[in-house]
A protein has these predicted regions:
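Charged/polar, solvent-exposed surface patches and flexible loops
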Residues: 15, 19, 143, 257
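A generic structural signal for alpha->beta connector loops
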Residues: 22-24, 195, 251-252
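A generic structural signal for short, solvent-exposed coil/turn residues
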Residues: 17-21, 147-149, 190-191, 247
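Short beta-strand segments enriched in small/hydrophobic residues
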Residues: 1-4
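Proline-rich intrinsically disordered, low-complexity coils
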Residues: 22, 30, 34, 152, ...
């Protein structure tokens, strides 16, 4: 995104935070940071630990059963019911839920996750480079554990695709997209608030075939891309400032994650006045 688009993202986030949470949010002047230099701060021990927790889809050497167990555990601990999680995910699964248990649901989600990750790893960037290369920049854990890297920012906006699978499990809406993460909110003792909200703009702007298909075949204008990225930041601010969970199925609420990457449909259904408790 250009500097002008980034300003539009932050303006959309300010408006959205006011509408959804009644809070006035201000952002400092953005600073650009090289991603490689940031992740190079990880120690060899940290890299080894994070690698052990990650499913190695790039080399096809992951433990699928362990992955499914991790997702079953994550779904059990989710504040949403099993029925609500299944209802949210089922239209987008590539494998059937053979039994409506946490284990049965996790099997279907894991099959979908792996299939879509396999599709993603064959995609190219517009310059012909690999969408997912040998670096760890796409790995969720490197972002989720950014607080270990002496990173003093409350908000991060990146154009890097974040897509991976971890044995510790993740939310269902991320898994069914092939591990694509729109955003992460994570503890960070080096940031002013002690929590960093991270948004990836790649799901909104990326033009590889898989990402575009997950958007329903759409490519967005610069103005729409900035608006949708701003709303994704509002979603993360809900996690960051208010510790809000995911409001699966509550289409009026910004805390209901986008289905797949269909950001236009998601944004058009938002109605903060209809979301607030009465």
């Amino acid at each position: 995104m250009s500097a002008e688009q980034l300003r539009a993202v932050l303006a959309a986030a300010r408006r959205g935070a006011k509408e959804s949470f009644g809070v006035d949010v201000e952002f400092t002047q953005p600073e650009e940071q090289p991603l490689k230099a940031l992740f190079d701060r990880a120690t060899p021990d940290e890299r080894s630990d994070w690698s052990d927790l990650s499913y190695d889809f790039k080399r096809g050497k992951g433990d699928r059963k362990r992955l499914a167990r991790g997702y079953a555990a994550a779904f059990r601990s989710d504040e949403n019911s099993l029925d609500d999680q299944i209802a949210f995910a089922e239209p987008y699964l590539l494998a059937p839920v053979r039994e409506k248990t946490y284990d049965g649901f996790a099997e279907a989600v894991t099959a979908t996750l792996i299939a879509r990750l396999d599709q993603l790893k064959s995609q190219k960037l517009s310059d012909g480079g690999e969408l997912l290369d040998g670096s760890p920049s796409n790995e969720v854990l490197y972002w989720a554990l950014i607080g270990k890297l002496s990173f003093p920012y409350d908000v991060v906006i990146t154009n890097q695709l974040i897509a991976s699978a971890e044995y510790v499990g993740s939310s269902v809406h991320t898994a069914i997209r092939g591990g694509i993460t729109n955003g992460i909110t994570t503890g960070n003792p080096f940031s002013p608030r002690g929590v960093t909200a991270i948004v990836s703009t790649y799901p909104v702007t990326g033009e590889d075939g898989v990402t575009r298909a997950l958007r329903g075949g759409e490519s967005y204008s610069e103005a729409d891309s900035a608006r949708y990225a701003g709303l994704l930041l509002v979603h993360e601010i809900g996690h960051q400032l208010y510790d809000l969970g995911h409001a699966y199925g509550k289409n009026a609420c910004v805390m209901n994650p986008p289905a797949m990457l269909r950001f236009r449909e998601w944004a058009e259904r938002l109605s903060p006045a209809d979301c607030r408790p009465r």
